[in-house]
Each structure stands twice: as C-alpha cells, then as structure tokens.
Amino acid sequence: CITNNYKDINVELIDCMKYVNITIEKITTAAYREMAKKAPWAWGKIYADSQKGPLAHISSRSNKIMAIKLLKLLREKNPDLIISTHPFGSQMCSYLKRKQKITSKIATIMTDFAPHDQWLVGSEYTDYYFVAHNKMKQYLISKNIDENKIFDTGIPISNRFLLNYNKNDILSELNFTPNKKTVLFFGGGEFGLGKTKTVEIFECFVKLFPNIQIIAVAGKNEKMKTAFSKIVEQEKRNDSIRVLEFTNKVPEFMSVSDLVVTKPGGLTTSESLASKLPMVIINPIPGQEEENAQFLEENGIAIWIKKYDNPYEKLQNLFSDPKLLPTMKENTEKLSKKYSTQNICKILFN
C-alpha cells in the first residue's frame, strides 16, 4: 500500500528479531513450533503468564537488552516512522525512545482480536495503536492509553481483497456450479488439534453434505493432502471437491465461498471478515488463537468445534437451520474492515 500509493516515501522491511540475534530468533521460533505441535497447553500457559508477573518482567528485561543492538540499525537508517507488527519490536523501540536514543514516531499494529499486555509496554512512547475492533480500543483506553492515538482500523490485509472477481469464471475453473454452496476448508496447519481432528471434520463435510462443493487447501502438508484425497475417492466426490496444495488464490476462493473452515489466526480471520464469510473454527492454539476464537463465537460469526465436541452434531446444527448462516454473514459485516490497510496509511501519511 505504501509503495504503491505514497511514491515519495522510502520503505524498508526488517525482521528485527533476526537482526538483533538470529540464533535467539531461530530458537524461539523452533520452540514455539514444537510447543504448538506437541504441547499446545504449554504455549497457552506461557501466553497467559507473560501478561504480568515474573515472565512478563523477564520478557521486558530481555527486550531492553536486545534494543541496544537494534539501536545501531535505527541510527544508521534514521527513520521518521517505525511500524511494528510484533510486541517485541514495539517494546524495543519504545524503550529506546524513552531513553532519548531515537526520536522516530512509533506505530504499533496489533495483529489479533484480543489484547495482550505485552503490546502495551512502553505505551506512553508509542504514537499510534491500530487495533482490530472497538472493544480492543476500549480495553486500551481502560489501561490509560490516550484514546486519540488508538484507531480501530482493523488488521491490515492485501489489497487483492478489494478487487471484484468474476465468480462464475472462478467456479468454472474449478468445474463447480454457481447454484450450490461452496465451503473453503483450510486444513494445512500442523498445530492445534492436529491432523486426526482436522481429517475427522473434513470427513464430516464430505459425508454429511453431498450437495456442497468444497475447496480443500492442504498447504505444504502432504499427509493432510493424502488423507483428504483418500476420503474424496472413497466417497466418490471427485466431481464436487478440489484438494489443493499451497495456493496464492485465497482472495479469489473466498470470493466464491459461503463458509470458511480455518484456524483463527489474526490475518486469516481478517481476510474472512473482509470477504463477509461465516467461519467454522478448528485447531486454535491456546493463547491468542483461542482468544480470537472466543471473540468470533461470542459475536455470532463462527462455530467453534472444540477438542471433545461431536463435529457431526455441530455441523448438522449449522446447516439444518436456514437462518443461521445468513445471520452469521450479517454479523461479519459489523466487524468487516476490508479497507484496513488503506485507512492505516491515510492516518499515518495524510
């Protein structure tokens, strides 16, 4: 958005964690992946404990130490504005500003639908907060953050979600028909409830709803793709189900879908809301994803299939009530912020 619409502004994208210490970045990324895959409850506990107390203090102290190395880069680049989409980056920059080492404006973009206090460390030195919805804005205000620097713009998404797609052409490419409901099923994640539950839920859709078309995206997960394809073959549904690997056509597929089945990550959720898609939530990792799931369920946008839920029962209820999906779609419109990226840029640069 910046490079396309604000030609006089120089932009540089930097992974501050890799810059500060690539070894720590690799260790923390690997640890998160292993916990999310094998012991998601452990990540959930770390997430909760890092709100306040000893763990939050340790995190804050380590970010102050790492900020010293980041200072070298910031002095070299001397930016007018720093935009951060991670709490650690925001903390490091606000600490340097507090110590009068930098004078840059700082904009923090919170990338989930529930607040976490790690985002707010050093808030008095942050100039802009961009949040997903008004309740988050009210939470920040309750933490004594000046409401004039909080904007409920939504989480930034690709401008491809602003395009008008020819739905008939997209359906035709898939050999689908426009007079049937289409479900977009993201099953490539390797975290959360894992492969077994995901495959069980996919099988429910295939067996329960023969008149529904399904676009199943397995991503880079070969085992998931194989499992999906096997079910499709067994149920003789090759005519109305497409099992795909990684795709760059998410905006197009969302434009022709009536429902999305997905993990509730901040970006995918924002894209679904921009596309006005009701959601079936699967596999949320304890922590921010579970908080996202709770928010979406409470706002009548999503059905959350939990670990011990009967997916057959949940999905039967979803499709047996003719008013439920239309009502969920109406609810998405209340939180849809498809111009989030453009509005953030206008606030920062106009």
What spans do the regions from the language model cover?
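A conserved, positively charged/aromatic
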Residues: 74, 102, 118-128
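C-terminal "capping" alpha-helix adjacent to the active site of nucleotide-linked donor transferases
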Residues: 297-300, 307-324
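C-terminal alpha-helical cap of glycosyltransferases
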Residues: 337-350
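A donor-sugar binding/catalytic signature common to diverse glycosyltransferases
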Residues: 249-291
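A short, well-ordered alpha-helix in the C-terminal region of glycosyltransferases
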Residues: 324-338
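A nucleotide-sugar donor-handling region in carbohydrate enzymes
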Residues: 127-190
